[in-house]
Amino acid sequence: MVIDTSALVAMLNDEPEAQRFEIAVAADHVWLMSTASYPEMATVIETRFGEPGGREPKVSGQPLLYKGDDFACIDIRAVLAG
Protein backbone atom coordinates (compact mmCIF):
# COMPACT_ATOMS: atom_id res chain seq x y z
CA MET A 1 0.00 0.00 0.00
CA VAL A 2 1.17 3.52 -0.76
CA ILE A 3 0.10 5.92 1.98
CA ASP A 4 -0.65 9.52 1.04
CA THR A 5 0.00 12.50 3.29
CA SER A 6 -3.75 13.11 3.58
CA ALA A 7 -4.26 9.70 5.20
CA LEU A 8 -1.33 10.20 7.58
CA VAL A 9 -2.60 13.61 8.65
CA ALA A 10 -6.10 12.18 9.16
CA MET A 11 -4.70 9.47 11.43
CA LEU A 12 -2.45 11.86 13.36
CA ASN A 13 -5.31 14.30 13.93
CA ASP A 14 -7.78 11.54 14.82
CA GLU A 15 -10.13 12.75 12.10
CA PRO A 16 -13.41 10.85 11.49
CA GLU A 17 -11.77 8.53 8.91
CA ALA A 18 -8.74 7.78 11.09
CA GLN A 19 -9.94 4.42 12.39
CA ARG A 20 -10.74 3.14 8.89
CA PHE A 21 -7.28 4.18 7.70
CA GLU A 22 -5.58 2.60 10.74
CA ILE A 23 -7.39 -0.70 10.14
CA ALA A 24 -6.37 -0.67 6.47
CA VAL A 25 -2.73 0.08 7.33
CA ALA A 26 -2.63 -2.64 10.00
CA ALA A 27 -4.07 -5.18 7.53
CA ASP A 28 -1.34 -4.61 4.94
CA HIS A 29 2.27 -5.75 5.14
CA VAL A 30 3.83 -3.19 2.82
CA TRP A 31 3.75 0.53 3.60
CA LEU A 32 5.24 2.97 1.12
CA MET A 33 5.29 6.76 0.96
CA SER A 34 6.41 9.10 -1.76
CA THR A 35 9.58 10.99 -0.93
CA ALA A 36 7.55 14.14 -1.57
CA SER A 37 5.20 13.19 1.28
CA TYR A 38 7.84 13.83 3.95
CA PRO A 39 8.28 17.58 3.34
CA GLU A 40 4.56 17.88 2.56
CA MET A 41 3.77 16.31 5.95
CA ALA A 42 6.13 18.74 7.70
CA THR A 43 4.46 21.66 5.93
CA VAL A 44 0.97 20.49 6.90
CA ILE A 45 1.96 19.98 10.54
CA GLU A 46 3.61 23.40 10.82
CA THR A 47 0.68 25.07 9.06
CA ARG A 48 -1.89 23.51 11.39
CA PHE A 49 0.02 23.62 14.66
CA GLY A 50 2.62 26.32 14.14
CA GLU A 51 6.36 25.85 14.30
CA PRO A 52 6.27 23.96 17.63
CA GLY A 53 3.98 21.37 16.03
CA GLY A 54 6.73 20.28 13.69
CA ARG A 55 9.89 21.07 15.59
CA GLU A 56 9.21 20.71 19.29
CA PRO A 57 7.62 17.33 20.01
CA LYS A 58 8.00 17.88 23.76
CA VAL A 59 5.47 20.74 23.58
CA SER A 60 2.62 18.26 23.02
CA GLY A 61 3.43 16.26 26.17
CA GLN A 62 2.91 13.07 24.20
CA PRO A 63 5.24 10.06 24.44
CA LEU A 64 7.54 9.22 21.53
CA LEU A 65 7.30 5.89 19.67
CA TYR A 66 10.71 5.00 18.32
CA LYS A 67 13.09 2.11 17.62
CA GLY A 68 16.72 1.88 18.65
CA ASP A 69 18.83 3.87 21.07
CA ASP A 70 18.83 7.22 19.26
CA PHE A 71 16.53 8.85 21.82
CA ALA A 72 17.85 7.23 25.02
CA CYS A 73 19.29 10.48 26.40
CA ILE A 74 16.38 12.82 25.79
CA ASP A 75 13.80 13.97 28.29
CA ILE A 76 10.76 12.82 26.32
CA ARG A 77 8.73 9.91 27.65
CA ALA A 78 8.89 6.74 25.52
CA VAL A 79 5.77 4.83 24.43
CA LEU A 80 7.55 1.51 24.95
CA ALA A 81 9.89 1.26 27.93
CA GLY A 82 13.16 -0.62 27.51
UniProtKB/Swiss-Prot annotation:
One of its GO terms (molecular function) is metal ion binding. Keywords: Hydrolase, Magnesium, Metal-binding, Nuclease, Toxin-antitoxin system. It comes from the Bacteria. The keyword Hydrolase applies. Its cofactor is Mg(2+). Its EC number is 3.1.-.-. Mg(2+) binds at residue 4. Belongs to the PINc/VapC protein family. Toxic component of a possible type II toxin-antitoxin (TA) system. A putative RNase. Its cognate antitoxin is VapB34. This is Putative ribonuclease VapC34. The lineage of its organism: Bacteria, Bacillati, Actinomycetota, Actinomycetes, Mycobacteriales.
